[in-house]
Amino acid sequence: VASTPMVSLGVRKLGADLGIVITASHNPPSYNGFKLKSSFGGPSIPDDIAAVEKHIPEKAMKDLDSMDKIKEKGLLSYVNLEDMYYEHVMASFDIPAIRNSSFTIGYDAMYGAGYLIFPRILPQAKCLHCDYNPSFYGQAPEPIERNLKPFADMIKADPNMQIGIANDGDADRIGMFDGDGNFVDSHHILLLLLYYLHKYKGLTGKVVITFSVTDKMVQMAKKFGLEYEVTKIGFKYIAEIMTKEDVLVGGEESGGLAVKGHIPERDGVWIGLMILEFMAKAGKSLKE
């Protein structure tokens, strides 16, 4: 099982022209469809999508080669995208600091594509809904507060748990709870990311958000002397700017967030690890 960010990362690392993800994203499985990823490792821009659409036949094609014949022609090969992603994570984060920290981590995969990779990175995490179930047990795997009540209850029941992280069906979005089981929305996560990356890690760059995000992001960018831009709703607008400019943090209100040093793509696992690294370095809980 590969998450959407794994495919996006694979496209860029392998120098591919295009990536295709079959996913319902944060929707029920009946919404399964295509997500296209461009060569830069992010959501395809309108020009790339239009180029693909030109090749869609008016009638369904029936005379397609079998998978065996395609492999015989050398047109198909298999790549372990999970291993590629894991190695990229291990080279990018201080994972030992997170693993050796004193806080307990909760993780809700919502039966989605993060159910293998997150426990692999952090084996000590207490997992919920980390099973393979293509139907998501009938729930919509969107990491918003009303869909995460069992996860909130699990966190409240464990006095040692200081953070809960949830991902959607294809693991590109994030939801978060503090140790008291209070939901932490994307606005607050973005503020934490900006503070950590600039104040702790000394990084600079542009701040790009959609107009539905809290104005406190603009205020913080101004305070730090950083350039900022507010875009229309839709992560593709953020991704397009990330491919052309030096962007420190980008995000939208719906849980799609991206940061410097990674692909121009939403990545719920990556953002969760960034917050965990912040906690480990600061020695503080999420609530603090």
Per-region residue spans from a language model:
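Short, charged, surface-exposed secondary-structure boundary motifs
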Residues: P134-P141, Y195-L197, I238-T243
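General beta-strand structural signal in soluble alpha/beta enzymes
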Residues: V1, V21-I22, Y107, C127-H129, ...
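N-terminal small/polar loop signature for handling phosphorylated ligands or for N-terminal nucleophile
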Residues: V1-Y31, R120-I121, A125-F177
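Gly/Ser/Thr-enriched, mixed-charge loops and adjacent short helices
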Residues: N32-P159
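Phosphate-binding and adjacent anionic-ligand microenvironments
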Residues: N160-I163, L203-E288
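Conserved active-site and cofactor/substrate-binding residues in soluble primary-metabolism enzymes
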Residues: A2, P43, D47-A51, N80-M84, ...
